[in-house]
């Protein structure tokens, strides 16, 4: 099953001609999940030909303008594409007020259901039979959340040789075993799925962290992520400035990635003081701590692969 992340915008504070504000879209087959909705999100969705009609849920980190001002336009646009499914908007306190006020002031025409969920306590905020999204507190100048999208374990691989050895003929009985059901073999014995299936296999994990001072505890929340998107707003040596503004340097983000043993980290939410050519400084500093670091770029996409 395909799982990929699209960087819709990688900038922080203000948009630049070549850099939209922070927004990341995760696509799992036909389902879309948006993490933050900065200014320029609609433009990026159009350029990437992504079907915003299929966005299931939008997860907002906090209500600073550079993370949420793209939301009203996206809500209005969704009324123009015959959306039928409800849209979930999930975030910390003030998200519901922002959505409701925007609808009133802009006199929005909305022809689909919007379900807003404000997070009061960290934990699971969205789930299906195959995956869940968890939230956890960050430390910024207003209530701010990080998120992890994690698939549940998959069944182990089916062992046809084991099935044959247990006198289970090829056909519908094999399918039942793979579906988690017991069957009766040709010689009348009860065969359990675990008799012919290998160990369960790990699902994939995506984590999104932006706008927070350095917290070592973040590493536990994003542990073993396949793809970790994390703010790296400033270069090494600016730790004091970052702490005062409740942001992180690129090396602090890299330390979290290292401690969490993630597979790959993409820096995001760059300070507008850095041009694209100057971002290499952030990359070089981060790679001193965590070599598997890349720079987010607008319209970049990353495939998340299964381990096996």
UniProtKB/Swiss-Prot annotation:
It catalyses: Endonucleolytic cleavage of RNA, removing extra 3' nucleotides from tRNA precursor, generating 3' termini of tRNAs. A 3'-hydroxy group is left at the tRNA terminus and a 5'-phosphoryl group is left at the trailer molecule. Gene3D superfamilies: Ribonuclease Z/Hydroxyacylglutathione hydrolase-like. The active site is at residue 66. Pfam families: Lactamase_B, Lactamase_B_2. CDD domains: RNaseZ_ZiPD-like_MBL-fold (cd07717). Its cofactor is Zn(2+). Keywords: Endonuclease, Hydrolase, Metal-binding, Nuclease, tRNA processing, Zinc. One of its GO terms (molecular function) is 3'-tRNA processing endoribonuclease activity. Transmembrane segments: none annotated. Zn(2+) 2 binds at residues 66-67, 211, 269. Binds 2 Zn(2+) ions. Zn(2+) 1 binds at residues 62, 64, 140, 211. SMART domains: Lactamase_B. Its EC number is 3.1.26.11. It is an enzyme of class 3 (hydrolase). Zinc phosphodiesterase, which displays some tRNA 3'-processing endonuclease activity. Probably involved in tRNA maturation, by removing a 3'-trailer from precursor tRNA. Homodimer. Belongs to the RNase Z family. This is Ribonuclease Z.
């Amino acid at each position: 099953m395909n799982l990929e992340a699209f960087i819709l915008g990688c900038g922080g504070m203000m948009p630049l001609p070549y850099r939209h504000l922070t927004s990341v879209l995760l696509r799992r087959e036909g389902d879309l999940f948006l993490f933050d909705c900065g200014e320029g999100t609609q433009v990026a969705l159009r350029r990437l030909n992504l079907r915003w009609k299929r966005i299931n849920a939008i997860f907002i980190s906090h209500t600073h303008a550079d993370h949420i001002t793209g939301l009203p336009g996206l809500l209005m646009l969704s009324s123009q594409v015959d959306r039928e499914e409800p849209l979930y908007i999930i975030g910390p306190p003030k998200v519901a007020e922002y959505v409701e006020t925007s609808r009133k002031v802009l006199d929005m025409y909305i022809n689909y259901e919007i379900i807003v969920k404000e997070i009061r306590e960290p934990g699971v905020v969205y789930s299906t039979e195959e995956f869940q999204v968890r939230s956890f507190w960050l430390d910024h100048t207003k209530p701010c959340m990080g998120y992890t999208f994690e698939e549940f374990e998959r069944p182990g691989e089916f062992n046809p040789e084991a099935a044959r050895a247990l006198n289970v003929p090829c056909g519908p009985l094999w399918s039942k075993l793979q579906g988690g059901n017991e069957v009766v073999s040709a010689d009348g014995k009860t065969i359990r799925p675990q008799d012919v299936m290998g160990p369960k296999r790990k699902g994939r994990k995506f984590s999104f962290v932006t706008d927070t001072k350095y917290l070592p505890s973040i590493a536990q929340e994003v542990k073993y992520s396949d793809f970790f998107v994390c703010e790296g707003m400033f270069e090494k040596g600016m730790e004091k400035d970052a702490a005062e503004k409740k942001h992180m340097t690129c090396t602090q983000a890299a330390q979290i990635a290292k401690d969490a043993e993630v597979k790959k980290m993409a820096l995001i939410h760059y300070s507008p003081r850095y041009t694209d050519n100057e971002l290499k400084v952030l990359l070089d500093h981060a790679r001193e701590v965590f070599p598997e670091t890349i720079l987010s770029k607008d319209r970049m996409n990353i495939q998340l692969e299964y381990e096996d």
